[in-house]
Amino acid sequence: MTVLLEVKNLTRIFGSLRAVNGVNFTIREGELVGLIGPNGAGKSTLYNLIAGAIRPTAGAIVLNGMEVTGWKPYNAAKAGVARTFQIPKPYRNLNVIDNVVVSALMHHRSVAEARAAAEGILVDFGLSDYLESPIGVLTVGLLKRLEVARAVALQPRLVLFDEIMAGLTPTEVRSMTGLVASLPGRGITVIWVEHVLYAIMNTVRRIMVMHRGQLIADDAPEKIAKDPTVIKAYFGEEMPVA
């Protein structure tokens, strides 16, 4: 597979805190990669660096062979990087379909084309009954689906998911993991931050682990579950994979 994203010695310092400290990894096109670690490990800061929300103190970010270190969020979106947030941030003055149309307009010339694309995505994501509904009627689970739909409507090459399982019921988690697992089939590469570990451990083939700003492990889920360094740092005991 072709390399899509390279992170090279990426560092971000806030005062005396090294929130991200010399992180290196490569993501290939079509990968579905988990990123785990406790609160404060540096995951959100890493996302902010990749998405252009903040500039690194040192290091480089390369997307599709082009260095994009320090780019602006709108440049990231145009280049095909999308992200979601743990707490969904829809446009509450717009209905469900128009929230997705806003994203779809990035790559469609007319509102009609964008609306058709948005409707197709919402149908695929189980939101066909809510196209014209106001945001206020959506449950947490449906809001999370909308958040993913908005990201997919940007036609991203890479999407950064941030705890999309938070607040979901076990049934909703199973359904959402199916949606996430389907995205590489749409040509979308995924990095997925998650604290609902059973969801991520049973869905991805590769997991990266951050601790105190550093990447301490990068391996298959079954190996991560038995890695003594990971167990000691986060879990205190061996993690079940199934």
Predicted regions and their residues:
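Glycine-rich phosphate-binding loops of nucleotide-dependent enzymes
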Residues: 2-242
